Amino acid sequence: AGYSARWLQAVLRGRLGFGGAIFTDDLSMEAARHIEGRAISPVEAVRAALDAGCDLALLCNQSLDGGKVLDETIDGLARAQLTGRWQPRAASGARGQALLPREPAPDWDALMRSPAYLHALALIP
């Protein structure tokens, strides 16, 4: 479904009214990079997923090898944008921005002493 505009836009967003961010599967997994039985590159997979309606693409554990796959994907998206083969969606950017924290992270030591944290910790068997 991650490459299907029908499922992502018509069903998930349209029929079901989902307004949150849609993430891809981990596109570094080869099994997640097949369309119609054909293996595709991470760059092609990211473009296809974003074109279908995903807002954020996951390429997990790709900081290895100097981040080569990440760099190739960013470069590939930039080339696709310059040649008119892909355009980022403003709505996708807004949904991604909505996931960012609105305030600084709490101090770790203060968090570990907070009643909410201590209560949650006590619930763990």
Feature locations, PLM:
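C-terminal extensions of enzymes
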Residues: 100-125
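Second-shell residues forming the walls of enzyme active-site clefts
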Residues: 1-97, 105-110
